[in-house]
Amino acid sequence: MNRLHVDWTACDGRGLCAELLPELLVEDDWGYPAPRGDMSVPPALEPAARQAVDRCPALALRLTAPASS
Amino acid sequence: MISVAEAPPGRQVQLRLLAGSNDGRLDSHLAQHGRLPVLETNQVMGMARDAGLTGRGGAGFPLWRKLSAVAAGGRAPVVIANGAEGEPASGKDRALLTYAPNLVLDGLQLVALGAQSVVLYAPAAGHRALRELLDARRAAGLDRVPVRLVTAPDAFVAGEESAAAAAVAGRGAVPADKLVRITESGPGGAPTLVQNVETLAHLAMIARYGAGWFRAAGTAEEPGTFLATVSGAVASPGVVEAGYGVALGDLIAAAGGASAPLSAVLVGGYHGGWVPAEGALPVSRAGLMPYGGSPGAGVIVALPRNACGLMETARIAGYLAGQVAGQCGPCVNGLPRLASTLTDLAQLRARPGLPAEVDRLARLVTGRGACRHPDGTARLIHSAMRAFEADVAAHLTGRCLATDARG
Ligand SMILES: Cc1cc2nc3c(=O)[nH]c(=O)nc-3n(C[C@H](O)[C@H](O)[C@H](O)COP(=O)(O)O)c2cc1C
Ligand code: SF4
Ligand code: SF4
C-alpha cells in the first residue's frame, strides 16, 4: 500500500487535505493533518489521496511507495 | 538546572577511548596507538560490521549499514563528524574532542576515502585547538584527506543529522524533511554520511586492535564501550567510560557515588527515559527496554529523592519546547502546549483529566515533525508519567511527595 507523507517543514496547516480525505486524516488542535490510522492508503482511497496531493497548496503532501518514507 | 561540570577523564569503569594521557597531543597519541593502518573502504566496512559498532550519537544505528548505503550511491559523498552535542546534560563529545581528538580524526580519515568534502562539525569554542591539531596532522602526513571545520551552533537540534548537513552546506542548522534520506542525497545532492565523533573514535580503535578486541567489552548483542556523562545528585559529575551492560550503580559510583538518596535516574538524556534508581540495572538497550529507554548518547542524570521528578521533567520539557526549530506545525504548537500542561501538573495546578491530556498531547506530536525532536520529547514525558505515577496521583490531590520528603 502507498503511504501519505507530510513534509512538516512545508505544511501550512490550513487542513485542506483533511477535508478532502476525511477517511484518512483529521485536523489536529492547530489545523495540521493527523492520521486516523497509520497513513497507509487503501487502494479504494488512492484516487482521493492523489487529488489531495495535487491540491495541497504548499506541495507538502506526497504519496510514497511502501519501501521509502 | 542540572549542568555538566567540566568533565575530566580519569574515572572509569573500563577505559579505552580515554585510556591514554588525554593531553590531546599528536605525539602522545602516536606514542600510544601508532599510525593508523591504511585500509580500503571495504575493509573498514567489514571491520565495523564484525565489531558490531553502532552509532554513539543517540540512535544506535550500525555504522557499516550507513557506510554501505553511502557507498551504494556511487557518488563522492560529503562526510561529517558530528561533534555538535546540543544536549545540555551531555559533555562526552566535548571531552573526547578535548582529551582524545586524534582518535576522532583518525576515525574520520577511515570513512573519508573518496569523499568530496570532509568536515568536523563542532562548537566554535574548540576550533582553535582543533585547527592547530589538523595542521600538525597534515604536516606529519597523517591525513590523506583534508578536513574542514564548521561551527555547530549552540542549539539542541543543531546536531540532528540533516541540520548538521545543512550547516555544512552553508545554510541554517535546522533539520530537513526525510522523504529522501541524506545517505542518498543531502543538501547539495551528494550522499551524506553523518557520524557522531565518538563512533569515529571507536572505529579508529577497531582499525588498530581489531573487531575481536572491540567485542571483549560490552555484551554479545551490544559490544564495546561507550562514554557516559553522569550528572545530577552525584559527588563528582563528569564523563566516564564503560562497556554496554554496565550496572547503573557502577556508572554512578564512577562519578563519585550518589550524593543523596535517589528516586530515579534519567538515562539517555532529554530524549531518553526515567528508570528506577536500581544499582543492578544493566545500561544497555536490552536492559533498559522494559522502561522504554536506551543508553542513547550516554547521558545519565541522578534525581535525588527530595527533588520532584515531575517538576524536573516539566523543566526539561520547557527547555525542549524552547528549542523547536520553528518549522513544523505539530512540533511548534504541540511541544509548548505539552510543556505547559505538564507544568500545571507539576506545580499542583491540578485539573481532572490533566494526566490524560498530557498523554494525548504526547501521542499527538509523535512522528509529526521533520526530525525526531517531538518523538524524543514525547518519549521522555511518557516515561515520566510511568516512573512518577505515585507523584502524579499525589499531585492530583494537591500534595508533592518530594516536598513531603524534605520534611
Ligand atoms: C533533535 C536531535 C538532536 C541531535 N543531536 C545530536 C548531536 O548533537 N550529536 C550527534 O552526534 N547526534 C545527534 N543527533 C543524532 C543524529 O541525528 C544522528 O543520528 C547521529 O549524529 C548519527 O551518528 P551516529 O550514527 O554515529 O550516532 C540528534 C538527533 C536529534 C533528533
Ligand atoms: S493541504 Fe498540504 S499544506 Fe494544507 S494541511 Fe494538508 S498537507 Fe498541510
Ligand atoms: S520537528 Fe520540531 S525540532 Fe524538528 S525540524 Fe520540525 S520544528 Fe524543528
Regions inferred by a protein language model and the residue ranges of each:
Chain B
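Cofactor-/ligand-binding subdomain signature composed of acidic, glycine-rich
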Residues: 1-45
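Gly-rich Lys/Arg/Thr-decorated short loops/hinges at beta-loop-alpha junctions or inter-strand turns
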Residues: 29, 80-93, 184, 229-234
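Small-residue-enriched alpha-helical segments and adjacent helix-cap loops
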Residues: 34, 39-46, 51-54, 87-88, ...
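Ferredoxin-type iron-sulfur electron-transfer modules in oxidoreductases and energy-metabolism complexes
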Residues: 34-45, 74-77, 93-96, 122, ...
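Conserved phosphate/anionic-ligand binding catalytic regions in large, soluble enzymes, centered on
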Residues: 49-70, 155-166, 321-333, 369-381
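Glycine- and Gly-Pro-enriched alpha-helical subdomains that act as flexible
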Residues: 77-80, 84, 97, 101-112
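Short amphipathic, charge-patterned alpha-helical segments
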Residues: 105-111, 243-259
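Hydrophobic alpha-helical positions that pack around
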Residues: 126-244, 255-259
